[in-house]
């Protein structure tokens, strides 16, 4: 919706005055003089033009209020169509998996002192012939699993 330009009410007022067709000699004359030739119809037209000026001057504010109401109505969160678990905020299901993996990793770190973590996290597929522990994240800086095993912290 385009806003009206600020000079539009001024142009409307000039148009209304031009429509009155006031005969003059170039000098301003008082309107109270009955010899001007102004009749009631022309004065009513002038009053109508000026009465339309006020709503046009506040129209940008009305448009802004309508826009704010629209944003308020449509920016609210919609009600869920299915029940949502209260423990989790509404996120992608893979994000729930990432949280579970992080919990598992923390348990492994806590159990490291007891020596059971390596047993729980060994590869169990056909490619793992040695039963090496797998990493949730790959080793960095070009290190291998064997390099990690040799470094005893």
From Swiss-Prot:
GO terms for biological process: neuropeptide signaling pathway. It is found in: Secreted. Residues 27-69, 70-105, 106-108, 144-153 form a propeptide. InterPro entries: Neuromedin-U_amidation-site, NmS. Keywords: Amidation, Cleavage on pair of basic residues, Neuropeptide, Secreted, Signal. The keyword Repeat does not apply. The modification Asparagine amide is found at residue 141. GO terms for cellular component: extracellular region. Belongs to the NmU family. Implicated in the regulation of circadian rhythms through autocrine and/or paracrine actions. PANTHER family: NEUROMEDIN-S. This is Neuromedin-S.
């Amino acid at each position: 919706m385009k806003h009206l330009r600020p000079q539009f009410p001024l142009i409307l007022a000039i148009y209304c005055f031009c429509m009155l067709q006031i005969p003059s000699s170039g000098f301003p004359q008082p309107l109270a003089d009955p010899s001007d030739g102004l009749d009631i119809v022309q004065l009513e037209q002038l009053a109508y033009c000026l009465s339309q000026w006020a709503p046009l001057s506040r129209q940008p504010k009305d448009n802004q209020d309508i826009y704010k109401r629209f944003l308020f109505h449509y920016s609210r969160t919609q009600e869920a169509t299915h029940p949502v678990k209260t423990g989790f905020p509404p996120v992608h299901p893979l994000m729930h998996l990432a949280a579970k993996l992080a919990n598992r990793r923390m348990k492994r770190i806590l159990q490291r002192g007891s020596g059971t973590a390596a047993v729980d996290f060994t590869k169990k597929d056909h490619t793992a012939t040695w039963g090496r522990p797998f990493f949730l994240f790959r080793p960095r800086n070009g290190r291998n699993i064997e390099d990690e095993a040799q470094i005893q912290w």
